[in-house]
Amino acid sequence: MTASTALTVAIWIGVMLIGGIGSVLRFLVDRSVARRLARTFPYGTLTVNITGAALLGFLAGLALPKDAALLAGTGFVGAYTTFSTWMLETQRLGEDRQMVSALANIVVSVVLGLAAALLGQWIAQI
């Protein structure tokens, strides 16, 4: 095995391990928020996605080396945030005829997500 191959394998193992940490943290944050707030709206998923957008914006603002960005961005933040759960919860709100909540979930997630990413980048650059 060459040094380059060994480094690539180490990075991918790191992404898997750090991704595991990100997914466990997502579970803990989601459940903690969901326990404290109304169950009719997916506040837990909203919380992880907004904080994840802020963190990814922050990491992007740092201009990390490629391997560090892969570990932190793809590994941790990619596992911490969840597009698929956001879509499923929005679809379920629609199924339950909670159209205002479904639309609010989309609009609030996109607007706050963009704002959080911009804020994260700004913080990294000061």
UniProtKB/Swiss-Prot annotation:
Presence of the UniProt keyword Ion transport in the record: yes
Mode of membrane association: Multi-pass membrane protein
Record GO biological process: cellular detoxification of fluoride; fluoride transmembrane transport
Function: Fluoride-specific ion channel. Important for reducing fluoride concentration in the cell, thus reducing its toxicity.
Annotated catalysed reactions: fluoride(in) = fluoride(out)
Protein name: Fluoride-specific ion channel FluC 2
Predominant location category: membrane
Source organism per UniProt: Mycobacterium tuberculosis (strain ATCC 25618 / H37Rv)
Lipid biosynthesis in keyword set: no
Residues that, per the record, bind Na(+): G78, T81
Spans traversing the lipid bilayer: 5-25, 44-64, 68-88, 99-119
Top-level division of the source organism's lineage: Bacteria
S-S pairs: none
The entry's keywords: Cell membrane, Ion channel, Ion transport, Membrane, Metal-binding, Sodium, Transmembrane, Transmembrane helix, Transport
NCBIfam families in alphabetical order: crcB, PRK14228.1
Description of how activity is regulated: Na(+) is not transported, but it plays an essential structural role and its presence is essential for fluoride channel function.
GO CC annotation terms, alphabetical: plasma membrane
Family assignment from sequence similarity: Belongs to the fluoride channel Fluc/FEX (TC 1.A.43) family.
GO molecular function: fluoride channel activity; fluoride transmembrane transporter activity; metal ion binding
Subcellular location per the Swiss-Prot or TrEMBL entry: Cell membrane
